[in-house]
């Protein structure tokens, strides 16, 4: 999976800004050396809004699979999702298309911080452990560590996409993906996602 700088997810398809931003994004996708500042200045002049590109990325995959985009109603949240498969024919099935839709909705609604636990900010993780230890400092040491690990597992289920409860059932996202893969007799792997929200800063 490759990632490069790209303003694509900043599109707003059902607003005046979207009508201006979409051609900018399309042009940059075709030519990554395009002068975004020149186009940004032109867009500001056309619609009278102070447009700022605070974050811009793109996703791509090597081999079978798909990269899909979703803009939520109201154009306040946008999602890019990259999912890999082993078979080209998998991507044409209704089950796979539904999976793409479901996972983008999951990302929109649940706002995960990372794909899985290996991608979490380790300093944040250690801070969560410290908070849990402080909360239960009066417990026996052995009990504290068990409680802390339980709290961390809960934290994973809140902030890691694959560990989150799937929006449509009581299983995890990881288990749902596995069930669809089994149904299609293929291997399906979520490789990466990007979530954008209007008003976010580069530090968000």
Regions found by a protein language model. Give the residues of each.
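N-terminal assembly/interaction segments in proteins that build large macromolecular machines
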Residues: 1-204
